[in-house]
Amino acid sequence: MQGPVYGLSTAEADLHPDLLPNFHYDDIFGTVVNRFLVQSVAGIPLTVYGGGGQTRGYLNLKDTLQCVALANRNAANKGELKIYNQLTETFSVSELAEKIKAVARAMGYPVEIKSIENPRREREEHYYNPSHSGLIELGLDPHFMTELSLIHI
C-alpha cells in the first residue's frame, strides 16, 4: 500500500525544470495536501470535508523513490511474497489543514479553515494504524512533513 505522495523536489528533479513532477490539486488526481496549499495562496478557505477525521498515510516524493530502490535491492526470492507499506506518517484531514494553515499564516497568507458537507461516500472516523516498519528496517531515511518541506512545495 502506498499513501498519498506530496512534494516536488528530488535530487533528479532539482537538476532541471523539465524534470519537475506534476502538481495536481484537483479532486480527482490531486492530494488534499496540494489542494490545501493552492487554496491557502489563492485566498480560499481550506475546505475540510465533514469533520475532517479521514486519516491516511502520507509519503514524501523523495521517500517514494527510496522505497522503490530499497524494495528492488531486497527483492523477494522465488515463491516468496514481500509487501511493504509505503508511508512514513499518518494525518487526518483536519490535522493537515491546521498544519498548512499555520505555515501559510507564517508566510503572511490570511488562511481560514471551512468545514463543508462531505461529498464522498466514506466513513469520516475509522481505525487506521498501518504498520510501516518494513522499509525503515531496510534503510529508508524518511523526509517528514515539516514546516520547511511545506514551504518548499
Task: Give the residues covered by each predicted segment.
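Histidine (H) residue identity feature
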Residues: 2, 16, 22-27, 126, ...
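C-terminal substrate-binding subdomain of Rossmann-fold SDR/epimerase-dehydratase oxidoreductases
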Residues: 40-151
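A conserved pocket-lining segment of Rossmann-fold NAD(P)-dependent short-chain dehydrogenase/reductase
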Residues: 3-59, 80, 85-87
